[in-house]
UniProtKB/Swiss-Prot annotation:
This is Probable cytochrome P450 513D1. Disulfide bonds: none annotated. The lineage of its organism: Eukaryota, Amoebozoa, Evosea, Eumycetozoa, Dictyostelia. It is an enzyme of class 1 (oxidoreductase). Its cofactor is heme. Keywords: Heme, Iron, Membrane, Metal-binding, Monooxygenase, Oxidoreductase, Transmembrane, Transmembrane helix. Its main location: membrane. Belongs to the cytochrome P450 family. Its EC number is 1.14.-.-. Heme binds at C464. Pfam families: p450. It comes from Dictyostelium discoideum. The gene is cyp513D1.
Length: 519
């Protein structure tokens, strides 16, 4: 045996001893938390294939609101129910704030993006983005969203018989509309960031781009063995191959667009020579604000690209899937769809000159619509959106956290170093959250004094700063399209569309074909 082999073996032994010593403390503290039995080395990883959120719901119903599972060698605690999540992530927010760092993710983003970064760097990123996504600034940007809804409505108009695309005017979409709907939310983010957008058609490049984003979001939510079984990392560090290829593909596109934007729109800041001059530069959008911080050496360029990828990927996939599930809910609950149509028709009646009457009216009728001032006119629609977010939670498990100090939650002591998961999916579908949780009922949100508290992307100090963009996009999307179109099952009005979401970082809507009729 050569000296190099001996050194490697000794290194592995020392590493394993350190790992066992560290894990012994965490396991010793966490062992009193109930949970399923785990297997040697792999823990419960083999149980977490496919519909992970449904398995965690099954365990919640068996073990309660605080339970323990093993991701390989990583002790993990799953928290469910609003009171439990609030106790952890709000009442003890500081020690639950950090993200659990997974090598597969940091290999791609270097831990420099908003979703995965920690500490002061994360706080600086969040402040930079939050300052650019205030309600006041979003009021000025509502027009961008309304223009995209108007363009999307042209696609639906073609399906319904008003044009030559989509379905040839038959009323039924020839292909699933998932990528087109996600293109709407992608275009909103591209317009907000770069002042560009893609057309709404089944172009092969656009289809591949949206399919890549969907694939990435489905895979990035899954637990990879290489992240949790250290001894396997050297052999599996580039697996699954598709995940890394999808990330690099989207990163290349966003980097190119960002570089082009700088050359075209930011010659002023690019030529600044002093810190004071850069400090005095007034950004006009989120991208310029991030690039300003880069010029001030407060964010590396990889951090700029990482944050843009968070906004674009998460913005298109979470919002897009929520819009898709909204359409599914309209089709599967035709009585609710009619209630919404009547409410919207009365709120935006023709006598006021506010008739939402087609893409050609973007300059007048649609541009008068405002999320900020018009929500009060549509309480049932607001309740419907909340119920969609409850019934089809867009981030079923959010992004895992890391506990940085020992803490007691609901009577159970949890060890420092534990991975912690927010079980949003099970929370929204639990009896503790609302009565009859498996029934789709917007009425539960009409009583504002006693309504359940929705968790959209997560709870606590890592709450997504872009949540208001998400809310505006969905509201305007639904007001305009419900007023213009009737949506139904493509084969038989008495049939139900499949609404079982597929697990991913965001809950994926099944492939959706739909019948569209003009109102």
């Amino acid at each position: 045996m050569g000296i190099s082999s001996i050194i490697i073996i000794l290194f592995i032994i020392v590493l394993l001893k350190k790992l066992i010593k560290k894990e012994d403390r965490i396991h010793r503290i966490n062992k009193n938390i109930p949970g399923p039995k785990s297997k040697l080395l792999v823990g419960n990883l083999f149980d977490l294939k496919g519909q992970v959120h449904e398995k965690l719901k099954e365990w919640y119903e068996q073990y309660g609101s605080v339970y323990r599972i093993e991701f390989g060698s990583v002790s993990t605690v799953v928290l469910t129910e609003y009171a439990t999540l609030k106790e952890a992530f709000v009442d003890n927010g500081e020690i639950f704030q950090s993200r659990f760092q997974r090598k597969s993710r940091t290999t791609c983003n270097k831990g420099l993006n908003l979703a995965n970064s920690n500490g002061e760097y994360f706080n600086h990123l969040k402040k930079t983005l939050s300052n650019e996504i205030t309600n006041q600034k979003m009021k000025k940007n509502e027009k961008i969203i309304k223009i995209q809804v108007g363009l999307l409505s042209e696609f639906f108009n073609e399906i319904s018989g008003g044009g030559g695309g989509g379905s040839g005017g038959s009323g039924i979409s020839k292909e699933p509309i998932n990528n087109i709907i996600k293109m709407y939310s992608l275009n909103v983010m591209l317009s907000l960031l770069f002042n560009i957008h893609f057309p709404y058609n089944n172009n092969s490049y656009q289809d591949e781009l949206m399919s890549t984003i969907t694939r990435y979001f489905k895979s990035t939510g899954l637990p990879y063995p290489s992240d949790f079984i250290p001894i396997l990392y050297p052999f599996l560090k580039n697996k699954p191959k598709e995940y890394f290829e999808d990330y690099e593909s989207v990163k290349k596109l966003i980097t190119r667009i960002t570089n082009e934007y700088q050359l075209k729109h930011m010659t002023e800041i690019s030529n600044k020579s002093t810190i004071e001059e850069i400090e005095n530069y007034q950004p006009t959008n989120i991208l310029e604000s991030l690039l300003k911080q880069y010029r001030l050496n407060k964010i590396p360029y990889d951090g700029v690209i990482g944050c843009l990828m968070d906004l674009i990927l998460a913005g298109s996939d979470t919002t897009g899937n929520t819009c898709l599930f909204s359409l599914v809910a309209l089709v599967n609950n035709s009585n609710i769809q009619e209630k919404l149509f009547n409410e919207i028709s009365n709120a935006f009646n023709d006598d006021d000159g506010d008739e939402l009457n087609g893409a050609n009216d973007i300059s007048n009728s649609l541009l008068k619509l405002s999320y900020f001032s018009d929500r009060i006119k549509t309480p049932y629609l607001v309740a419907f959106i909340k119920e969609v977010k409850r019934y089809y939670p867009c981030a079923p498990l959010s992004v895992p956290h890391l506990l940085t100090e020992d803490c007691e939650i609901q009577g159970y002591k949890i060890a420092k170093g534990t991975q912690v998961i927010q079980n949003i999916y099970s929370t929204h579908l639990s009896q503790s959250f609302c009565s009859n949780p498996l029934e789709f009922s917007p009425e539960r949100f009409l009583d504002s004094t006693n309504e359940p508290k929705i968790i959209t992307f997560g709870i606590g100090q890592r709450k997504c700063p872009g949540e208001n963009i998400f809310e505006i996009e969905i509201y305007i999307f639904l007001v305009y399209l419900i007023k213009k179109f009737k949506f139904s099952h493509p084969i038989d009005d008495n049939l139900q569309l499949n609404d079982r979401g597929q697990f991913g970082l965001s809950l994926q809507c099944p492939q959706l074909n739909i019948k569209v009729e003009s109102r």
